[in-house]
């Protein structure tokens, strides 16, 4: 923006900026769709393309490029995962003629469908989806990214913060080494984990150090999380990984977390909802860090 203020050297300035951005994006692993010189003051390349050749650029306007970008598909191809946000207890609504509870939330992964077998985390109880409610009341299916109400075929212990996870058919289920979740016929397609490798953007004035304990919010569930190790700090200007034993405010780094209870986490690249957490200071209740899961163990 503001390249009109450069005057006759706008093309040269834009060339330098474009080269620097392309280099940075390559090092950071960011795919660049377009780099557009604009002038908000004069409207160049914002809604309509500027005069051909302005700043040495002859491509489309910013608005045209944004409108042509593909919409990021919802995570419908992933196994069903549903964080429970609210429990409507023993509804007398006509939508649930048997008076069962409705579990409301937004589908994180997959598709909510009638007949889907699920396992409740953390209780481990299993059930089958009997009804799916949505904005059209009884749509039958609700895809990831949309809000839904789920009614199960039997009464199980489900509260706000719990997760409903798709079950793997017995023939596909693999026996895990985790005693708490090794029941093959009811194994979930997303094995819960207590240990996470993650990238954190640290926002608290109190530095992040190994051994500190925080509240971690995953979906709508709160669990205690201990910082097992600070692996490295990311140098913002060079993207180099620097050795570090702590992270100060506004730092980004790689850490390892040990959770008090298992959660259904997966890498952020695969699922935005299941791959993100928020760390909160247990004493001050300040939001301390934003976490992107890289791997679970």
Residue ranges of each PLM-predicted region?
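C-terminal effector/interaction modules appended to NTPase cores
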Residues: 91-297
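Residues that form ligand- and interface-recognition hot spots within folded domains
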Residues: 88
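Active-site glycine-centered loops adjacent to acidic/histidine catalytic or metal-binding residues
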Residues: 1, 39, 115
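Polyanion-binding loop/helix "lid" in catalytic or ligand-binding cores
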Residues: 84
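Short, solvent-exposed loop/turn segments at secondary-structure junctions
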Residues: 3-7, 234-236
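A generic structural signal for short coil/turn motifs at secondary-structure boundaries
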Residues: 5-10, 45-47, 93, 138, ...
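Canonical P-loop GTPase G-domain recognition
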Residues: 6-79
């Amino acid at each position: 923006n503001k390249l009109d203020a450069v005057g006759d050297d706008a093309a040269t300035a834009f060339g330098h900026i474009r080269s620097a951005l392309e280099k940075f994006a390559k090092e950071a692993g960011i795919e660049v769709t377009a780099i557009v010189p604009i002038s908000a003051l004069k409207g160049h390349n914002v809604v309509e393309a500027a005069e051909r050749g302005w700043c040495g650029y002859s491509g489309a306007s910013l608005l045209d490029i944004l409108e042509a970008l593909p919409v990021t598909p919802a995570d419908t191809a992933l196994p069903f995962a549903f964080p429970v946000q609210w429990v409507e207890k023993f509804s007398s609504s006509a939508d649930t003629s048997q008076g069962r509870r409705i579990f409301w939330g937004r589908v994180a992964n997959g598709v909510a469908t009638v007949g889907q077998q699920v396992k409740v985390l953390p209780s481990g109880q299993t059930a089958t989806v009997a009804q799916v409610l949505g904005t059209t009341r009884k749509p039958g299916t609700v895809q990831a990214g949309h809000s839904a109400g789920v009614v199960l075929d039997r009464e199980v212990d489900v509260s706000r913060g719990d997760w409903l996870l798709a079950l793997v058919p017995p023939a596909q289920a693999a026996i895990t080494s985790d005693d708490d979740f090794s029941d093959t016929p009811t194994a979930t397609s997303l094995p819960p984990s207590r240990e996470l490798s993650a990238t954190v953007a640290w926002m608290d004035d109190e530095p992040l150090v190994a051994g500190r304990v925080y509240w971690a919010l995953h979906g709508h569930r709160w669990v205690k999380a201990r910082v097992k190790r600070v692996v490295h700090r990311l140098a913002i200007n060079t993207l180099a990984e620097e050795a570090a034993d702590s992270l100060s405010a506004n730092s980004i780094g790689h850490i390892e977390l040990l959770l008090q209870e298992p959660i259904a986490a997966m890498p952020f690249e695969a699922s935005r909802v299941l791959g993100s957490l928020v760390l909160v200071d247990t004493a001050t209740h300040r939001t301390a860090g934003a976490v992107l899961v890289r791997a679970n163990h």
